[in-house]
Amino acid sequence: MDMSYLKDMPIAILGAGGVGKTMAGDCALAGKEVRLWDSPRFAKMNFVNIEKTGITLSGNQFSYFGFQRRGTAKVALATDDMAKAVKGAGIIIVAAVAIAHEDIFRQLIPLLEDGQVIHILPDNCGTFICRKLMREMGCTKKVIVGAWYTAPYGIRIVRRGGVVTNECKVEDRITTIRGCALPDCDTDDFMASAYYIPAFGAIIDAEGEVTISKKGEEFHHGFVRGNTVLDINLSNVNPVIHVPGAVLGAAVMQNFDTVLGKNKADYSLY
């Protein structure tokens, strides 16, 4: 399918945490119309002054081939009304933690329109939940639902004086990402739609590049087609990195403000 119809359509981003807010700013800086949604529970905190300040992308932004996008841009809409966010959008990006997926999809599914493409990142089995709920809720809209194994950046939202700001400190941008759709027959169209997401800029910029490791192995940059959605979820390194780090660092967490005399607010797994 020719996915070029997505070129001039708005992008809706569901979830205004670190990944969602950064992707919103990134896409807006590239000139896209972006609608950013967050649940009423978090919107008051995550949208403080966003209409006045816009979203700023800062940080080192390390990327192997040097791609960066810096500056401040305003989104077209920041709202806790999902219907307003997704109406007429071509691409819907779900950038939320796994425990929020079911609630988000239960709200989203009745609002879906034919031709929309849903990108879930990181997927954390969200594609399975979405398709399962679509069947249960009797949704017959012709949409594409696909998974990415991770987010396109390593980022932190800057906090000042306990206030969540609209500055996104991007430390690095990845140059390769694995993706797949559910069902797999939609994967080619899903991968093609990714070129209309400016937040994947470093990946698009690196498309076709090949680097050689010290062991002589070839590493291909750009978008990589996964075998299945299950493959995508098993490709996520976070469980391998974060679980051992949390378990082995439990004593440090417990004693950060006592034995170590540090401020608990400054604790980081890293």
Over which residues does each language-model region extend?
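NAD(P)+-binding Rossmann beta1-loop-alpha1 motif at the extreme N-terminus of oxidoreductases
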Residues: 2-64
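Solvent-exposed alpha-helices and their adjacent loops that cap or buttress functional pockets
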Residues: 3-6, 70, 85, 169-172
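Nucleotide donor/acceptor-binding cores
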Residues: 9, 143, 175
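Short beta-strand/turn micro-motifs composed of small residues
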Residues: 15, 38, 96, 122, ...
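Rossmann-like NAD(P)-binding element
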Residues: 66-121
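Rossmann-like NAD(P)(H) cofactor-binding subdomain of soluble oxidoreductases
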Residues: 98-164
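Active-site-lining helix/loop region of Rossmann-like oxidoreductase modules
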Residues: 169-270
